Swiss-Prot record:
<feature type="repeat" description="MVP 1">
    <location>
        <begin position="2"/>
        <end position="56"/>
    </location>
</feature>
<dbReference type="InterPro" id="IPR039059">
    <property type="entry name" value="MVP"/>
</dbReference>
<dbReference type="GO" id="GO:0038127">
    <property type="term" value="P:ERBB signaling pathway"/>
</dbReference>
<dbReference type="GO" id="GO:0019901">
    <property type="term" value="F:protein kinase binding"/>
</dbReference>
<dbReference type="GO" id="GO:0072376">
    <property type="term" value="P:protein activation cascade"/>
</dbReference>
<dbReference type="Pfam" id="PF17796">
    <property type="entry name" value="Vault_4"/>
</dbReference>
<dbReference type="GO" id="GO:0042802">
    <property type="term" value="F:identical protein binding"/>
</dbReference>
<comment type="function">
    <text>Required for normal vault structure. Vaults are multi-subunit structures that may act as scaffolds for proteins involved in signal transduction. Vaults may also play a role in nucleo-cytoplasmic transport. Down-regulates IFNG-mediated STAT1 signaling and subsequent activation of JAK. Down-regulates SRC activity and signaling through MAP kinases.</text>
</comment>
<comment type="subunit">
    <text>The vault ribonucleoprotein particle is a huge (400 A x 670 A) cage structure of 12.9 MDa. It consists of a dimer of half-vaults, with each half-vault comprising 39 identical major vault protein (MVP) chains, PARP4 and one or more vault RNAs (vRNAs). Interacts with PTEN and activated MAPK1. The phosphorylated protein interacts with the SH2 domains of PTPN11 and SRC. Interacts with APEX1. May interact with ZNF540. Interacts with TEP1.</text>
</comment>
<keyword id="KW-0963">Cytoplasm</keyword>
<feature type="cross-link" description="Glycyl lysine isopeptide (Lys-Gly) (interchain with G-Cter in SUMO2)">
    <location>
        <position position="444"/>
    </location>
</feature>
<keyword id="KW-0687">Ribonucleoprotein</keyword>
<dbReference type="InterPro" id="IPR041136">
    <property type="entry name" value="Vault_4"/>
</dbReference>
<feature type="modified residue" description="N-acetylalanine">
    <location>
        <position position="2"/>
    </location>
</feature>
<keyword id="KW-0007">Acetylation</keyword>
<feature type="cross-link" description="Glycyl lysine isopeptide (Lys-Gly) (interchain with G-Cter in SUMO2)">
    <location>
        <position position="704"/>
    </location>
</feature>
<dbReference type="InterPro" id="IPR041134">
    <property type="entry name" value="Vault_2"/>
</dbReference>
């Protein structure tokens, strides 16, 4: 800021800029001085402190002044300092200096940069110049300033970055890349973009054209791991082995314990060791041959115990597999993939490709690479009533094997027998043909625990007094099996399914069954009939039935049982037809009176009896059963369970008449019950009144006795109160007198005890005070005696220690010294005084010497 003062005092190490307004030239005035401003001059700013650069610091001045060889400032013809415009000057530690007009402090005082060990500065030349060694440096050149040291900045050089050394530890390597053609630290020539590893342990400072990519850690290898590598290009590894581009190989712990992947190596992964136990084997696909190449399409079987690494390109077929250990009940079905021979010596057997054979245990078997294990077979244990279906694959013939443990041969397979869906459903149902025969539909359906094994022989347990028909479609014949029996189906046999009617009234095909119950049993049906007078009725009839079979060994007779598929429906229809025909010829009243006889004769029919009528003719009588000759079904009895009108009006009228009869009967019973209840109520009321009168008389007697007792009690009470009051007053006076006497006696005793206690206390206090005083006096006397002894002993020991000569010298030392001092002065003095001022001549010598009366100099306070 310009100042208008005429006199400017410039302190030391300060300066100002003065502008000559006539010539427009500025100059510098440096203190210490007092500057007188001229009229044509102008001071541009107040005194400013000079620029001081301390040691190990620097600053940058823009547009610096030009200097000659003697470092003197150059001026032009006008007297203005000559500047190097657009230039810079780096000034280090020196004496304080001013800034000339036009100079600018571009960078303030800054400490010099200290480059530490393992550190370097990346420098780049901005201009062409010659260094201090005389070497030419071209613009764009780059180099490093490595520590330790202090970097002196130059205006032609730019600091690009600070480079830190990278510490390489054990099992590590530094990956570098060349930014341009250069020589590495080992003096090896590198081309642009080339990468390499530095494996030496310690701090590594990359060169100026070396770029650090990353720090590569070594892969630690053990006995159980290997490193899978692939070559990125043709190169030789550290062991001198040449690798081609794309080649893959393994590095194991036998090669090195820790492997640092090279720049030309690509790590594909860590391969674990494959360990086979004594009961294991594996099949290696595309195994590696002696030439180090994979044999594509080949296989190699390796059996344990063994440990190995899978080479690149190798893979396991189905992993590690267990050796087949076969027992006596086990076998292996094998298939030859290639021609081979098995066995030794005379037992050697040749197999062609595609052959199948079976080997049986007990043995251990490891299949070769030319053999495929089709399946492992187990002997199928079969009980006496169990079996399987076996088919010969060569002939196609199917047979059933029942009752013994069986193992399939190489040409046999299990055959699945298919059954109709209806038969499957009936076999899977859990209801008993006998116990569940009365249930509707398929109630009590039990879900099977598992699906039926179709290779097992189909068997069915025929219950007691039942029959099952099995039909052989190949032989075209049927056989009937009677229960209790277990029937098993041959491969070509099927069950005959019965489709029976069920329900009320009977519905066809409502129930299906595999077995035919032979009875005796019953079934119920509902039929509608019409009488001669057109009354429609609904009957519910139950029939007892059974099958009559004379010879079960006769095939023709047994086949008749299944000749009628629905014997229930056919029998019910036939019987209903007979009943309708019989009822249609009688009126309702006749049928109502003789319904059982009419129905029985209609069902069973009638025959001539031996009894004769009035006219001598034989009388008809009802048979006791009805026989169906087609299948031998016998109906032995019939039960009429209900008869109901079908017409609604008739049914309502019948119900009303029944209700009216019931109501009349109910009303009569109600009236009789009501009359009986009234009679019983009258009797109870009379008994109650009589009991009340008796209770009142008893209460009056009790009241009389109570009043007498109250009067007696009041008399006794008045007499007792007066007597008790007098006795209590006399007793109170007596007790009060005795208490006064006792109180006076106790007070006298207490006063005597109190007086004696006080006297005893005072006596003991006086005795204790006397003892205390005597002990205190004795202690004082003892103390005084001991102090006197101590003083005497002290004085005695002091005199003995000083000795008689020393004591005498101390006694005469003062006077002798005074005499000698006066003699040494040689003064003769005259003393004139009057009698009113007595003078102590004994202390005169002390006063002259400046001593006190005791011969000691005065103490300075």
């Amino acid at each position: 800021m310009a100042t208008e003062e005429a006199i400017i005092r410039i302190p030391p190490y300060h300066y100002i800029h003065v502008l000559d307004q006539n010539s427009n030239v500025s100059r510098v005035e440096v203190g210490p001085k007092t500057y007188i401003r001229q009229d044509n001059e102008r001071v541009l700013f107040a005194p400013v402190r000079m620029v001081t650069v301390p040691p190990r610091h620097y600053c940058i001045v823009a547009n610096p002044v030009s200097r000659d060889a003697q470092s003197s400032v150059l001026f032009d013809v006008t007297g203005q300092v000559r500047l190097r415009h657009a230039d810079q000057e780096i000034r280090l530690a020196q004496d304080p200096f001013p800034l000339y007009p036009g100079e600018l402090l571009e960078k303030d005082i800054t400490p010099l940069q200290v480059v530490l060990p393992n550190t370097a500065l990346h420098l780049k030349a901005l201009l062409d110049f010659e260094d201090k060694n005389g070497d030419k440096v071209m613009a764009g050149d780059e180099w490093l300033f490595e520590g330790p040291g202090t970097y002196i900045p130059q205006k032609e050089v730019e600091v690009v970055e600070i480079i830190q050394a990278t510490v390489i530890k054990q099992n590590q390597a530094l990956r570098l890349r060349a930014r341009k053609e250069c020589f590495d630290r080992d003096g090896k020539e590198r081309v642009t973009g080339e990468e390499w590893l530095v494996r030496s342990v310690g701090a590594y400072l990359p060169a100026v054209f070396e770029e650090v990519l990353d720090l590569v850690d070594a892969v630690i290898l053990t006995e159980k791991t290997a490193l899978h590598l692939r070559a990125r290009q043709n190169f030789k590894d550290l062991r001198g082995v040449a690798h081609r581009t794309g080649e893959e190989w393994l590095v194991t712990v036998q090669d090195t314990e820790a492997h640092v992947p090279d720049v030309y190596e690509e790590v594909l992964g860590v391969v674990p060791i494959t360990t086979l136990g004594p009961r294991h084997y594996c099949v290696i696909l595309d195994p590696m041959g002696p030439d180090g190449k994979n044999q594509l399409g080949q296989k190699r079987v390796v059996k344990g115990e063994k440990s190995f690494f899978l080479q690149p390109g190798e893979r396991l077929e189905r992993g590690i597999q267990d050796v087949y250990v076969l027992s006596e009940q086990q076998g292996l079905l094998l298939k030859a993939l290639q021609p081979l021979e098995e066995g030794e010596g005379e037992e050697k057997v040749a197999h062609q490709a595609g052959d199948r054979w079976l080997i049986r245990g007990p043995l251990e078997y490891v299949p070769s690479a030319k053999v495929e294990v089709v399946e492992e077979r187990q002997a199928i244990p079969l009980d006496q009533n169990e079996g399987i279906y076996v088919q010969d694959v060569k002939t196609g013939k199917v047979r059933a094997v029942i009752g013994s443990t069986y193992m399939l041969t190489q040409d046999e397979v299990l055959w699945e027998k298919e059954l109709p869906s209806g038969v499957e459903e009936l076999l899977n149902l859990g209801h008993d043909p006998l116990a569940d025969r009365g249930q509707k539909g398929t109630a009590k359906v039990l879900q099977p625990s598992a699906a039926r094994n179709k290779t097992r022989v189909v068997s069915y347990r025929v219950p007691h007094n039942a029959a099952v028909q099995v039909y052989d479609y190949r032989a075209k014949r049927a056989r009937v099996v009677f229960g209790p029996e277990l029937v098993s189906l041959d491969p070509e046999e099927q069950f005959t399914v019965l489709s029976l009617s069920a329900g009320r009234p009977k519905r066809p095909h409502a129930r299906r069954a595999l077995c035919l119950l032979l009875g005796p049993d019953f079934f119920t049906d509902v039929i509608t009939i019409e009488t001669a007078d057109h009354a429609r009725l609904q009957l519910q009839l139950a029939y007892n039935w059974h099958f009559e079979l004379k010879n079960r060994n006769d095939p023709e007779e047994t086949a008749k049982l299944f000749s009628v598929p629905d014997f229930v429906g056919d029998a019910c229809k036939a019987i209903a037809s007979r009943v309708r025909g019989a009822v249609a010829s009688v009126t309702f009243d006749d049928f109502h009176k003789n319904s059982a006889r009419i129905i029985r004769m209609a069902v069973f029919g009638f025959e001539m009896s031996e009894d004769a009528g009035p006219d001598g003719a034989l009388l008809p009588r009802a048979r006791d059963r009805a026989v169906f000759p087609q299948n031998g079904l016998v109906v032995s009895s019939v039960d009429v369970q209900s008869v109901e009108p079908v017409d609604q009006r008739t049914r309502d009228a019948l119900q009303r008449s029944v209700q009216l009869a019931i109501e009349i009967t109910t009303n009569s019973q109600e009236a009789a019950a009501k009359h009986e209840a009234q009679r019983l109520e009258q009797e109870a009321r009379g008994r109650l009144e009589r009991q009340k009168i008796l209770d009142q008389s008893e209460a009056e007697k009790a009241r009389k006795e109570l009043l007498e007792l109250e009067a007696m009690s009041m008399a006794v009470e008045s007499t007792g109160n007066a007597k008790a009051e007098a006795e209590s007053r006399a007793e109170a006076a007596r007790i009060e007198g005795e208490g006064s006497v006792l109180q006076a006696k106790l007070k006298a005793q207490a006063l005597a005890i109190e007086t004696e206690a006080e006297l005893e206390r005072v006596k003991k206090v006086r005795e204790m005070e006397l003892i205390y005083s005597r002990a205190q006096l004795e202690l004082e006397v003892s103390k005084a005696q001991q102090l006197a002894d101590v003083e005497a002993k002290k004085f005695k020991e002091m005199t003995e220690a000083l000795g008689p000569g020393t004591i005498r010298d101390l006694a005469v030392a003062g006077p002798e010294m005074q005499v000698k001092l006066l003699q040494s002065l040689g003064l003769k003095s005259t003393l004139i005084t009057d009698g009113s001022s007595p003078i102590n001549l004994f202390n005169t010598a002390f006063g002259l010497l400046g001593l006190g009366s005791d011969g000691q100099p005065p103490v300075q306070k």
